[in-house]
A protein has these predicted regions:
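Structural motif
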Residues: 5-7, 126-129, 192
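Conserved phosphate/ATP/ADP-binding segment of small-molecule kinases
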Residues: 157-158, 168-242
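Active-site glycine- and acidic-residue-rich loops that bind
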Residues: 109-111, 137-146, 170-177, 203-206
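Conserved N-terminal subdomain of the carbohydrate kinase-like
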Residues: 46-135
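Active-site metal-binding loops of divalent metal-dependent hydrolases
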Residues: 10-12, 135, 166, 261
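Glycine-rich phosphate/adenosyl-contacting loop at the front of the ribokinase-like
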Residues: 1-72, 252
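Conserved phosphate-binding/catalytic region of the ribokinase-like
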Residues: 1-7, 205-281
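A cross-domain feature marking catalytic cores of carbohydrate-active enzymes
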Residues: 12, 54, 164-166, 197, ...
Length: 281
């Protein structure tokens, strides 16, 4: 089997969301890295390989999750299965039109995605594009987090591009200092950082988007894209900085996973040979 052109590393969770019936919930599967792969799959030719590395339990929900991934033409073979573990789960509740989230992920199998690093090493060696996020880092133990970043550093080269979406979620981290140390370490092995100004202001106290870009470039990233809601995004690629206004959307249907979809468009565009500036949606 051909190895993936694009490899994502992260967690896929069970989603319970309100349905048309007030007494029932709709089950789905979602997670930031997987969402990006899912949307990228829609944009890429069917014969281009996309792979997802995580860890699964040995329960029925894990079986259903693996079937779901395969049905969408994303490869999750050669991935650890952990006895006694199950997928993480989150539930969406609506109150006065506002969404809130409750999470259950303590025994998520994905926390042990580094259980057999040789499986991941083989995939990294053949992937053209590597994609991970701050949530990927947050769910791992410090030792596994360090190992993952060391493995990425070993394969990073001129013909391979590493994407990192900082996706700062403070509640996933033991404390702010551990989060900042991990994000800095990821920035040092990343080619393209994808982030949002709101996240970076909360996590690092940056005053504006240029300050965010300067920090990541100083750590070793080659390019940085900072989104700012309906305001223009900032792309800094080496010494070149460009402000990119978003396409006008008068009435968004749903902002869920909007950042993941943005990243998918960039990933698919660069996989097709576009420059980073050309590929930004």
């Amino acid at each position: 089997m051909a190895m993936p052109l694009c490899l994502g590393i992260g967690e896929l969770m069970v989603e319970l969301a309100p349905s048309d019936s007030p007494d029932h919930l709709r089950r789905g599967f979602a997670g930031d890295v997987f969402n990006t792969l899912y949307y990228a799959r829609m944009l890429m030719p069917a014969d281009w390989q996309i792979g997802f590395h995580t860890a699964f339990g040995t329960d029925t929900l894990s079986d259903d999750m693996m079937d779901f991934i395969a049905q969408h033409n994303i490869d999750c073979t050669n991935t650890p299965r952990i006895e006694g573990r199950s997928p993480g789960l989150y539930m969406i509740t609506l109150q006065d039109g506002e969404r809130s989230f409750s999470y259950w992920r303590t025994i998520s199998a994905a926390r042990l995605l580094m259980r057999n690093p040789d499986l991941l090493a083989a995939k990294l060696a053949d992937a053209r594009f590597i994609y991970l996020s701050g949530i990927t880092l947050a769910i791992l133990s410090p030792a596994d987090r360090q190992l993952l970043l060391e493995m990425i550093a070993q394969v990073r080269s001129a013909d391979r591009t590493v994407f990192f979406d900082s996706n700062i979620r403070e509640k996933l981290w033991p404390d702010g200092e551990e989060m900042r140390v991990a994000i800095k370490a990821a920035g040092a092995v990343t080619d393209i950082v994808l982030s949002s100004l709101d996240d970076e202001k909360r996590g690092f106290g940056d005053a504006d988007a240029p300050a965010v870009a300067d920090r990541y470039l100083g750590w070793g990233a080659q390019a940085v894209v900072i989104k700012d809601g309906a305001a223009p995004s900032l792309l800094v690629d080496g010494n070149d900085a460009v402000w990119l206004p978003p396409d006008m959307v008068h009435l968004p249907v749903d902002s869920t996973a909007a950042g993941d979809a943005f990243n998918a468009g960039l990933l698919a565009g660069m996989a097709a040979g576009k420059t980073i500036c050309e590929a930004i949606p």
